[in-house]
Amino acid sequence: MIEPLVVEELHYSYPDGTAALRGITLALGTGENVALVGPNGSGKSTLLLHLNGLLLPGRGRIEVGGKPLSASTLEFARRFVGLLFQNPEDQLFMPTVGEDVAFGPQNLGRKGEKLRECVRTALERVGLEPARFLERQSYNLSIGEKKRVALAGVLAMEPEVLVLDEPSAGLDPRSRRRLIRLLTELPQTKLVATHDLDMALETCTRTIIIDRGQVVADGPSDQILADRVLLETHGLELPLSLGR
């Protein structure tokens, strides 16, 4: 069976020469929910930006849906992998919510009633009533609403893999709980970069720790996230639900 996402010996350095990723190797199985955790500056966001081709590897190989990621396969990769940015302001740029959510599928050729139904379905999936939100101006929304609109825009593309960068950051408790429920319901393969280790424990069966651009641990979440020494060695703390 083809694994939806494979990364082998991925290296990447910033333009100033700073090494951001140093030999990252990982693979995600179909339908798997995986948390990606690590301290600030560990390379999490840089890795995610590689997974739908916003950054291309310095060295190493990425396969998306069985196809090597390269300049010639970017269109396929960006349909296959939906990326949610940490800051929704980086993702919302159209005048209204409806236009933001429609942007992706419209560029894939959807139009008319099929496009409208796609937008309505995506908004409903993230708990936003189309009648209330379609004509809302994105810049007037709360941070939680903006994050949900951004996620609706990703879901409207119907990707096979969801790559989410700090999806719970800035959310109030009710919005966070709604997000957790949604993550457990969505059928896609998911890679979730987060500092919210309680959310990781609740939504992801597997956890990968990266530090200084390298994978330092990879295993079942209930083992990785209960290992106080391992977590503290890499600038993390036990989830609150496990006690500190």
Curated annotation (Swiss-Prot):
Pfam families: ABC_tran (PF00005). Residues 5-237 form the ABC transporter domain. Its main location: membrane. It is found in: Cell inner membrane. Belongs to the ABC transporter superfamily. Probably part of an ABC transporter complex. Responsible for energy coupling to the transport system. This is Putative ABC transporter ATP-binding protein gll0289. It comes from Gloeobacter violaceus (strain ATCC 29082 / PCC 7421).
